[in-house]
Amino acid sequence: MAKDNRRNLVSHPGEILKDEFLQPLGISVYALSAAMGVPRTRMNDIVLGRRGITADTAIRLGKFFGSEPQSWLNLQQRYDLIIAETEPYNTLSCVRTLKEVTDAGDFLA
C-alpha cells in the first residue's frame, strides 16, 4: 500500500475515542474529563486530534473504560508512526542503512 494511502486510512486516537466510545455511550468530553480528573481542554484537544494520548492519559482512559492502557498507547504509536512515515518533508532519505555504510567502508569502530 502506498504511504499516502496509509495516511488516509489511519485515524487519530481521539477520533476513535469519540466515535467508538464517547458517542455510543452518550458520554460528553466534559463528563469524561471530570471522571478522569483531567482538564477538559486536554480531552477536548485529544478528541479534536490536536493532542496525542500520553501514558498518563492512557492509564486514566484504561481505568475509566476498563481497558488496557497499552491499547490506547498502541493507537497513538501507530498513528504517530504512519504520520511520520508519510510526511512530505520526511528527511529519512538522508539516513543510510548499516549495509550502505559498511559496504562503503565508512563504518568506524
Which functions belong to the PLM regions below?
Residues 2-27, 74:
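A short, Lys/Arg-rich alpha-helix, primarily the initiator
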Residues 18, 43-44, 69:
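Alpha-helical structural signal
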Residues 22, 33, 62:
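The alpha-helix within a helix-turn-helix
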Residues 26-45:
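Short alpha-helical DNA-recognition segment
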Residues 39, 50, 65, 76-79:
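The DNA-recognition helices of helix-turn-helix-type DNA-binding domains
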Residues 45-48, 74:
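Base-recognition residues in the alpha-helical recognition helix of bacterial helix-turn-helix
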Residues 50-63:
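Short, basic-rich loop-to-helix N-cap that marks the start of a DNA-contacting helix
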Residues 73-109:
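Short, charged recognition helix plus adjacent turn
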